């Protein structure tokens, strides 16, 4: 009997995992349709100052941003269970906060509701260290509602990173479902607080 592989390994999944999710999500959205003008950006130098994201934010002038990332899985031996937020097989991570960016609260709530409604497994995370391209993108222009969706990954900057393919698929599904739900009215509701 053939067993299905649920874990994969490879070099430097941060941020190759996010790029792969973006490609798969865009393929699906192009085939099945959506209400938006979508722009994909594969940026460079996130680890040394989000340089690519800074210029991308200026060039794209986005109304809303979904950052796709390969964040750390905290389920490795020796890591305190009380500090563990991301685990392989626990679903896509929805990041609420890190030292460089705070998720738009309405977009975070929409991501969580979208995942719940679609039965997509997810993990809410708050990181005490690190950051993503959301650091630059959420500050571009007049400010951009942003959310980080991540595929939890062990040993993210090593030659042998490990991820769970179920988390990967959950990230693709949530990215697609969230993009579909973000029509003009939904995007405007992310930043308009007064009647």
Where are these regions (language model features)?
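Acidic, glycine-rich active-site loops and adjacent beta-strand->loop/helix elements
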Residues: 42-48, 70-72, 128, 153-155
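Short, small-residue-biased leader/transition segments that mark boundaries at the very start
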Residues: 1-6
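A short glycine/serine-rich beta->alpha loop
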Residues: 7-13, 97, 162
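Alpha-helical metal-binding/catalytic segments enriched in His/Glu/Asp
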Residues: 9-47, 171-178
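A glycine-rich helix N-cap at a beta->alpha junction
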Residues: 56-76
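Active-site loop ensemble at the mouth of alpha/beta enzyme cores that anchors a bound cofactor
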Residues: 62, 79-94
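Short, well-ordered secondary-structure micro-motifs
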Residues: 50-54, 76-80, 135-136, 159-161
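Active-site-adjacent substrate-binding region
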Residues: 89, 93-172, 177-195
């Amino acid at each position: 009997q053939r067993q299905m592989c649920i874990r994969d390994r490879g070099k430097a999944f941060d941020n190759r995992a996010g790029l792969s999710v973006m490609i798969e999500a865009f393929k699906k959205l192009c085939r099945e349709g959506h209400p938006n003008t979508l722009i994909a950006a594969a940026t460079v130098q996130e680890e040394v100052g989000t340089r690519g994201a800074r210029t991308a934010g200026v060039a794209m002038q986005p109304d809303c941003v979904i950052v796709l990332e390969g964040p750390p899985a905290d389920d490795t031996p020796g890591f305190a269970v009380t500090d563990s937020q991301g685990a392989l097989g626990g679903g896509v991570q929805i990041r609420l906060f890190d030292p460089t960016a705070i998720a738009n609260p309405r977009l975070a709530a929409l991501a969580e509701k979208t995942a719940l409604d679609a039965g997509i497994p997810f993990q809410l995370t708050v990181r005490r260290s690190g950051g993503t391209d959301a650091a630059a993108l959420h500050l571009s222009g007049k400010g951009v509602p942003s959310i980080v969706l991540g595929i939890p990954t062990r040993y993210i900057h090593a030659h042998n990173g490990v991820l769970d393919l179920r988390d990967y698929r959950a990230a693709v599904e949530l990215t697609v479902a969230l993009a579909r739900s973000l029509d003009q009215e939904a995007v405007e509701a992310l930043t308009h607080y007064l009647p």
